């Protein structure tokens, strides 16, 4: 499979050299290394050019949205579209460290399962690169029943839990590059729902990155209401009913084209409000 590494950057000077060095140290070197920069004013681009040399492809963010979630999602979708000539795209945050076999491992899973998306686990590190307690899967746990669940049950789980972290994921651009991401959804959350609806989602227990936890993260380990009971979540839904209704509408209109008959039923009914609130 032809492979692209896609890194989205913004003011990435403190960490980018280590991140790109870990990409270049892979057992399977990517065919393309694409960096999409969102208006950095520090030395991000100079560092990237020095580390990667002529192999680096630099893109500039096209979105002007002031909404953080919409902006992040748009950046990754723009980057994925730029990599659509490749069969696999390995997604990366600007401050994480890739384990040496990450590309080889995730490409193998994409191929073996004909998957749209593979989401791996990761260790946690601090700003200095030191390991800290926990892992991505401990922060965003996946129900143990996932592996044996029927497709409809997996769809319910994907609606209820955030099952994929973008910086630890690999995707197929031919399946996802043309998929519009509704406002209010992050790219990794929406793509994981599309892949689950199509029964093409792989949750990988292997730790493939060191995920950096810093105060400057755009999206961190905030689980929000993921573990809250239905009562608290329904209360939250009432307080933000307009946003919730928009998200439900996005699910009902955006996912059915990808859903199998086993998963489409989960995209309708009151359970959506309960799962998304």
Region spans (language model):
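Acidic helix N-cap motif at the loop->helix transition within catalytic regions
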Residues: 17, 42-50, 101
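Conserved nucleotide-sugar donor-binding catalytic segment
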Residues: 145-224
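Short loop->beta transition adjacent to catalytic acidic/histidine clusters or analogous donor-positioning motifs
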Residues: 1-3, 24-35, 43, 55-57
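A conserved acidic beta->alpha catalytic loop
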Residues: 37-46, 63
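Glycine-rich, basic loop-to-helix element that forms the pyrophosphate-binding segment
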Residues: 63-84
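Short, well-formed alpha-helical segments that are part of the catalytic scaffolds
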Residues: 12-25
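Short beta-strand-to-loop acidic/aromatic patch adjacent to the donor-nucleotide binding site
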Residues: 86-95
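Conserved donor NDP-sugar-binding/catalytic core segment of glycosyltransferases
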Residues: 97, 102-134
């Amino acid at each position: 499979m032809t492979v692209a590494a896609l890194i989205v950057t913004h003011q990435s000077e403190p960490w980018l050299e280590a991140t790109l060095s870990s990409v270049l140290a892979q057992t399977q070197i990517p065919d393309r290394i694409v960096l999409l920069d969102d208006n950095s004013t520090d030395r991000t681009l100079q560092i990237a050019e020095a580390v990667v040399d002529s192999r680096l492809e630099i893109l500039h963010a096209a979105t002007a949205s002031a909404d953080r979630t919409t902006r992040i999602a748009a950046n990754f979708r723009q980057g994925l579209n730029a990599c659509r000539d490749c069969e696999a795209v390995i997604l990366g945050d600007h401050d994480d460290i890739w384990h040496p076999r990450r590309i080889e491992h995730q490409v193998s899973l994409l191929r073996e399962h004909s998957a749209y998306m593979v989401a791996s686990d990761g260790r946690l590190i601090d700003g200095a690169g030191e390991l800290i307690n926990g892992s991505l899967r401990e922060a965003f746990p996946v129900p143990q029943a996932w592996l044996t669940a029927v497709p409809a049950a997996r769809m319910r789980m994907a609606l209820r839990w955030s099952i994929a972290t973008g910086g630890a994921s690999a995707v197929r651009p031919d399946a996802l590059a043309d998929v519009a991401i509704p406002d209010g959804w992050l790219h990794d959350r929406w793509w994981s729902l599309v892949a689950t609806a199509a029964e093409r989602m792989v949750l990988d227990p292997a730790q493939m990155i060191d995920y950096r936890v810093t105060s400057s993260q755009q999206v961190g380990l905030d689980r929000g209401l993921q573990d809250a009971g239905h009562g608290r979540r329904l209360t939250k839904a009432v307080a933000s009913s307009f946003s919730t209704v928009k998200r439900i509408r996005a699910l009902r209109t955006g996912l059915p084209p990808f859903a199998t008959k086993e998963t489409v039923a989960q995209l309708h009914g009151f359970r959506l409000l309960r799962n998304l609130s």
